Amino acid sequence: MSISTFNRCWSKVILETLVRHNVKHVCIAPGSRSTPLTLEAVRLQERGEVRCHTHFDERGLGFLALGMAKSTNSPVAVIVTSGTAAANLYPAIIEARQSGEKLIVLTADRPAELLECGANQAILQENMFASYPVATVNLPKPGQNYAAKWLISTLDQACHSQLVEKGVVHINVPFAEPLYEANVTEIDEHVWLGPVRRWLGQHKKWTEYQEPQLEVLMHEHWDDWRTKRGVIVAGKLPQGHGMGLKLWAETMGWVLLTDVQSGVEPTLPYADIWLANKTVREKLLQADLVVQLGAHFVSKRINQFLSDFKGEFWVVDESPKRLDPYHHIQTRFNAKAHLWLRAHPPLRQKPWLLEAMALSNFCSSFIEQQVGGSLNEASLAHHIERAFPKNAALFLGNSLFVRLVDALTKRTENYPIYTNRGASGIDGLIATAVGVGIGANQAVAAVVGDMSALYDLNSLALLKKVTQPFVLFVINNNGGAIFDMLPVEAEAKNAYYRLPHNLGFAEAASVFDLKYARPYTWADLGSVLKQAYMRKEATVIEIKAGPNDATNLYKRLLEQISFAVIGA
């Protein structure tokens, strides 16, 4: 039995284990050392067990997998070769860890005898991602002295850890040469597979764990707490977990503050703006109880409110992680938001903070007036629902635009919104959005800034792989406009923060053979979008904006609302 054939046997067992842990997508970067894993993934695709996706850039590949994990709510496998190919996955691994997405990263490696001796493309890959994975498996060089049952049970345990805590599993897989010309018949009939052949013929995990029966119990003093003044703050929630929250809050008469990532229609929209009003904010801080559902809030004003609040504080989330950066004394419920609501029946009461309702209503007309009717960065954020059809998903990039949407949009439709707000980097956003679309098999509108687009320019190649309508908005305000919010001297801000580039994206779209448009009015945009969503391919739409237009509007809104006097 050749080394190359046994490398394939070893890889077969690895990938068969992952498939039984609900892996349906495998993202592969080209490389020689990962050949045994790649070719076994291809065999699984030929049997209809998985879909294989490729990209030449490992950093983008990691984010592509991340997007698929988001929209499928299932683990996605990534295969890369040894060396810096593996290191390029680090940003996506960090984001997956911070946002609780399930990736299974397979890094091919040189065997131990080739490490630290001057061998080519050999780096120290064991535990290279430090504490970011929820489980790390450093496999030995394939050898028949290791039972197939041991390999399966080891990987099975690692994959199970993702059910306990969502995140990344890193499996480092060293292979000795030769890597090619394996005998496929010998792979499947190898005696080493004998003890697990029956398992290979079934589609079941090696270990069937019984799910813990965690009933969500009502707080013992809920009958008392529900009569008091409360605030519900909804952060990033999984799709559907905010179901019924708006009605629940309205019944209770409690103030509901919602993040754009919550999937919940706000009862008091534009909270990021009206919370700038000192009078209303101080009255809100008089609440007896704050219940936080989810985490990772975009709004600076909501975060400031949470930081300043001194009363009773409850946190509800299915993750065991700490989700309170302000370190309140708190009651913690490990539960899904909608199940917690079901366990805590509301008591019908009148709203206790009428000033917030009045100010929110005032903001509606005031923001409309200030934004105006022209097509620009702020108006696109305010009217973001005009940018995509009802059957599409929305992906919001980081930096300024996601803040504008959070502040200026009155969400009325229940459509999925995806973000990378775990570490909130501007890297890999295009790749993540493509992954969302491929995983969900639905149309996507993605909005990123110009700096984000430049950072992830390689991922424009991935737009050729979409099979549903995909619209990539690039908001080009000639640099990092978010930094206009910083109290830094103008010349230094421009030279060291904003970094104006004076570039456009028509040529970039042309290089990657993508359709491109630059609309100047809402009528132009409507015509472009009508055509774009009729095509099962990608369209790049560049929205040119003044460097300071959106930030000046944002600052002006906050300043004027802060002094507003609103009668209840």
Curated annotation (Swiss-Prot):
EC number(s) given by UniProt: 2.2.1.9
Keywords recorded for this protein, A-Z: Magnesium, Manganese, Menaquinone biosynthesis, Metal-binding, Thiamine pyrophosphate, Transferase
MF GO annotations: 2-succinyl-5-enolpyruvyl-6-hydroxy-3-cyclohexene-1-carboxylic-acid synthase activity; magnesium ion binding; manganese ion binding; thiamine pyrophosphate binding
CDD domains, sorted: TPP_PYR_MenD, TPP_SHCHC_synthase
Cofactor: binding details: Binds 1 thiamine pyrophosphate per subunit.
Catalysed transformations (reactions): isochorismate + 2-oxoglutarate + H(+) = 5-enolpyruvoyl-6-hydroxy-2-succinyl-cyclohex-3-ene-1-carboxylate + CO2
Reported cofactor(s): Mg(2+); Mn(2+); thiamine diphosphate
Pathway(s) of this molecule: Quinol/quinone metabolism; 1,4-dihydroxy-2-naphthoate biosynthesis; 1,4-dihydroxy-2-naphthoate from chorismate: step 2/7; Quinol/quinone metabolism; menaquinone biosynthesis
Subunit text: Homodimer.
Name under which the protein is recorded: 2-succinyl-5-enolpyruvyl-6-hydroxy-3-cyclohexene-1-carboxylate synthase
Lineage: Bacteria, Pseudomonadati, Pseudomonadota, Gammaproteobacteria, Pasteurellales
